[in-house]
Amino acid sequence: IGFIGTGKITTSVITGLFRSKANLKQILISERSKKNSRALAKRLKQVKVVKDNQEIINRSNWVVLAVVPTVAKKILQDLKFKKGQTVISFVSTLNMKDLRRFASPATLVFKAAPLPMVESKLGPIVLYPSNNKVNALFNKIGTVINAKNEKENNYLWTLTAGMATYLELCATLENWLVQRKVNTAKAKRLVTSLVFGLSHTLLLSKQDTRSLVREYQTKKGINEELLLRLKKDKVFDKINKNLNTIFARIKKANDQ
């Protein structure tokens, strides 16, 4: 398997694959970025840095495209793929039509959206279209969520924009305590335990999430009060509105 582009996501995916003990004899990675590629090659003996992107394609059965969106088309237009190769793109703004055109004559072409936590074998991985072998590989490092079509794929990718916002909420809760002289480590431990407990509840519960929202508040209790205050301030309406804006951006990029 070869990776063209060695940023944070590529580093996380490769780290997760080795932690999952995936049977990969060799992983070829591009030199860009030099810092990440050298660190991976130094840490993992199966990883080899290759200076030329075309050489990665020539030597790989599976090719992962993980370059930044702004240069993706420029890089891909000069590359030649092979019939029978599996080509997987991590590029959010590259639509399937263009991807298939660039990857031709390869016909096994996919879009995937792994997130940084895959290095710990956690988190969703949006994948389109579904394929047993590709699903099996990515299920080793996360939870594959297959989109039924490209429109749904765009919807699912939109939700991945919520990572930093979720962490900002956690940071806000922590900082509220720290500002009131609570020890920083203690504040983080409380918030981390709270988030873990809620995530575990969501994972195991057979109820829909809206039912859990009702269950986790009592009449005239503090959970009900904070939720009602945030609703009155239209916090959740604003999140919904801005998700629509993010979706429009992804859709526009994929329609080009």
Predicted feature residues:
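Rossmann-like NAD(P)-binding element
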Residues: 35, 47-48, 53-86
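NAD(P)-dependent Rossmann-like dehydrogenase/reductase catalytic/cofactor-binding core
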Residues: 192, 196-256
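Short, charged/polar "capping" segments at the starts of alpha-helices
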Residues: 34-40, 96-98, 132
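NAD(P)+-binding Rossmann beta1-loop-alpha1 motif at the extreme N-terminus of oxidoreductases
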Residues: 1-51, 55, 178-179
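Internal alpha-helical scaffold of NAD(P)-dependent oxidoreductase catalytic cores
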Residues: 98-108, 122-204, 247-253
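Rossmann-fold dehydrogenase core element
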Residues: 85-89, 99-116
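Short, conserved loop/helix-junction motifs that constitute active-site signature segments
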Residues: 21-23, 78-84, 102-106
